[in-house]
Amino acid sequence: MHRYLLILTSLWLFSVSMFAEGDLPIIEMKADRTMIYPQRMELTGEESLMDILQMVPDLMIAGYEDVISNYNLRIDNCPMNGDTRLILSQMKAKDIAKIQVCDNTGVAKGTIGTNRVLDINMKMPDALKGFVEAQGDFGKKVEGIGSANALYGSNSTDLYANASYRHNDGNEEYLTLHMTNRFDDRNRLLTYFTQQYLGQPSGKLRKVMGRARYFHTFNDLGTELLIVGGYQYYSDWSYSKKLPLYIVELNTPLFTKRLSMMLGVEGDFLMTRQKNADWSSNTFNNDVYLQFTYTLPKWRFTVGNRVMFYHYKMKDSGIIQKHSDTRDNANACIIFVPDNRNQILLGYYRKFYEPSDGLQEEQTINQMKLAYAYGKQKLTVQTEASYYIVEDDENFTKLGVSAYWKTIWLSLTGGSNLYIAKSGTYASFRLAPTAYLPYAWQIGLQVVCYTKKSPIREKTGEPVYASLSVNKQFGKRWNLGIDWHDMFDAICSDVTVNRYAANIKLQYRF
């Protein structure tokens, strides 16, 4: 009798835990970003980061090279210098705890203009795991690619390492190292280093970044201090750039647990030099930002502002020009969450275009956004509608919708984006089914159609982009994949770049 009671109790506890996990939202909206939690989805284990990102309406996979458009890829808010296409296709969703699609983080992250951020938080294993991979690109050009990736997790230390090498007309080398050290329950240090080297016939390009992020938690309420120090270096055949930076940020509840505050200061000093010429520029930025969020059971209210003090000095053939200005990014947002599956967002965002060297004219963008998200384990739907008012330029409207559906043997992602302006209206439509077949076979197809006035179609001459991928898993260690991308290049008479090609890859996991 006791044995039966024990079995029934165990089954009940297991079902409760499974229900609780399934009841958690897969998609979570915040004022300035959308969070996706892959661990709450039903995964086969072979889904890549690129597969998950196709759930986002604004992330139209434009082609083989232009993978994430003007999104900056980061890990734990540290920019990556790696081969973006490789990282997106190799990083598995099962190794990701959270994806932050930051489309309006002008206050929190200091992004300006239309710049946006993809911030990845890894799910570290209990031991060492990783892979080595060899790829070959075959088409008008033949390229060889080698890469290695490692994840290590323990009670006190996490480590992420990624390195890749690409050989074509020249050589491309990438290296990223990211380590987390937890000294105790209230202190941790994240250190980050990345470098990029491109050796092309036209010259050499090198990027180096280093950053340290220290977190200290003061109390059980979650009051946390962040201190960041970093350095970036860039050099090519024409210019060299040096950039030291710092951030000090405090996140804390204020008066009540429902009200939270983010307060920070950030600064950097960009030194640019033109080689073999008497030209240089120095840019000194200092930012102060403040954001409040008030949370109720079904409502979240956010308001924030970042004030940027900008000082610019340029020297050209002995002539010095100076310019100073003060600008601000702002947001105000309301989110309604009736339950764990439905969310509605209404927001206002103000941001500006940073002036380029020699051009000190501010251009402000005001965006009004309405968004809806529905998510459960096997089905997600996201819709977005935004109206942009651009200073001294054309106003426009953007509409987007995407849906993801999963069964035992098939997953289907589709969506559409619409751009409306006086100068012209265009749209794009995406469909990406993936079939999971017996004997560890996987077949995926991605098709994106563009209407006549689409900038991508005008640039490439291609009304349809398509790619076909076939993967076969051999046991637990080996994976073989073949991708046929830019499939319609060969038959489109108006195409400007004929690069129809195939990619073959072999991966060994440890």
How should these model regions be labeled?
Residues L49-I52, L86, T111-A134, G146:
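N-terminal periplasmic accessory domains that precede
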Residues Q135-K140, S154, Y165-D169, F193-G199, ...:
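Transmembrane beta-strands of outer-membrane beta-barrel pores
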Residues E42, D126-A150, A163:
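Short strand-turn segments of transmembrane beta-barrel domains in outer membranes
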